[in-house]
Amino acid sequence: MLILDNKYVFHIPLYKYADNKLIRLDIDETLSNLMQQLNNEGYESLYKTKVKSYYKSRSFDELLITLFVSQKRVSDNKQELPDKVFKRWFKQNNNILQQEAYAYEHNNSMIIESLE
């Protein structure tokens, strides 16, 4: 039996906020790059869900990428933790995403890191 004891949920913006308006992002290729990076680290199964979010009185769509991992398996296989892959990807692509912060969930915690 395999027990996946760690849950990660990565918040992927589909819009940027500029000049007092929401502008849809064209991130299909960039998002495919994240999927490839996660796959390269051995994270082959995940869920992608489109949700409606609210922030600073603005309503917008975002993607939630959810994956469950086994901490023991990650350690045994010397895999990079998925949050490290996500953080690196987000910082490398923030010229496209143009966000002030990124957010992800790990188990029962929400982590938000400023990019400014």
Segments the model singles out, each with a brief description of its role:
Residues 1-116:
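Positively charged, small/polar-rich N-terminal and surface patches that mediate targeting and assembly
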